[in-house]
Amino acid sequence: MNTLFMHCRPGFEGEVCAEISEHAALLGVAGYAKGKPQSACAEFVCTEPDGAQRLMHELRFAQLIFPRQWARGAFVELPETDRISVLLEHLADLPVCGSLWLEVLDSNEGKELSTFCRKFEVPLRKALEKAGRLVDDARRPRLLLTFISGRRVFLGLAEADNSALWPMGIPRLKFPREAPSRSTLKLEEAWHQFIPREQWEQRLNDDMTGVDLGASPGGWTYQLVKRGMLVTAIDNGPMAESLMDTGLVTHLMADGFTWKPKHTVDWMVCDIVEKPARTASLIETWLGEGLCREAVVNLKLPMKQRHAEVRKLLDRMEAGFKERKVKVSIACKQLYHDREEVTCHLRRLDLKPH
């Protein structure tokens, strides 16, 4: 159980390796990271037997930016027939699990294996329950089986409350037909990622005001309108008629980087294609000056040193808020619907809700 296995967006294996190595060094967990380019996964192999468990115990999964899912465990080679007996053998020394997820990688090979996983899950679940290895209990660890092929699986464990919200970290969101662009799913996923479901009524409701910087044609505005908010859309480009017809949107032809609201708004969202450092200073201004209470903003990533750049900008924002003596929580994740970008969520903790 000395390997930490992580899923990620294909092409971001290096970022996962850099990020987990940094955390491991800070926590004094010895080991090395490896990830094949475009494989959609990376590993951190610990030199001590309890290394992976220590990492998962000391870190919150939500702190990690690039991994989509994680599990501690080991690879198991499977025979062509009677895979279940081999898995049961390996599970004998592990704790009884409280849930089971079968996962595949976000690659063409992974997609081909998903049918096999669907068929295999039913008999496997029955066998695990019969053997007393699987019970229905959220407090127990989750058993995560990531199939690399029909003959090779990563047999891993993770705590249900300290791992991805969805299998492989991939949300099943349906594209709403009336939304003006596919980017709408990025913001919807961000709500799920950063705001506990039981707080949606309180933090995303129709008494609120929102601003969408760089709004055209309105993919992100659509999500704010769907929650019943009054939205100011800032963009020199056109907005979708369907959004304007709701009567909830005011469209101002202005530059998203210079426009400011007269009063504090509840939400600012921004998905502008711009150098990440410029977007980061925009975030600093909006939260630092109390122009908004919460924000979801995308940072577009450079081609190289992507983890280092994100880390630098997050540290800079944190230092900026400290200097201004304002309390802001900062979270950052590469969402499933993100491409060469990460999504930041920020919240002023010292502003009274309206």
Curated annotation (Swiss-Prot):
State the protein's purpose.
Answer: Catalyzes the 2'-O-methylation at nucleotide C2498 in 23S rRNA.
Subunit description = Monomer.
Q: Which InterPro entries match?
A: RlmM_FDX, RlmM_THUMP-like, RNA_MeTrfase_FtsJ_dom, rRNA_MeTrfase_M, SAM-dependent_MTases_sf
Q: What is this protein called?
A: Ribosomal RNA large subunit methyltransferase M
- Tell me the active site: K300 (proton acceptor)
Q: Where S-adenosyl-L-methionine is bound, by residue?
A: S183, S216, P217, G218, G219, D235, D255, D271
Per UniProt, which keywords does this protein have? Cytoplasm, Methyltransferase, rRNA processing, S-adenosyl-L-methionine, Transferase
List the record's Gene Ontology CC terms alphabetically: cytoplasm
Q: GO MF annotations for this entry? A: S-adenosylmethionine-dependent methyltransferase activity
Species of the source: Pseudomonas entomophila (strain L48)
Has the keyword Transmembrane helix been applied to this entry? no
Annotated localization: Cytoplasm
This enzyme's EC code(s): 2.1.1.186
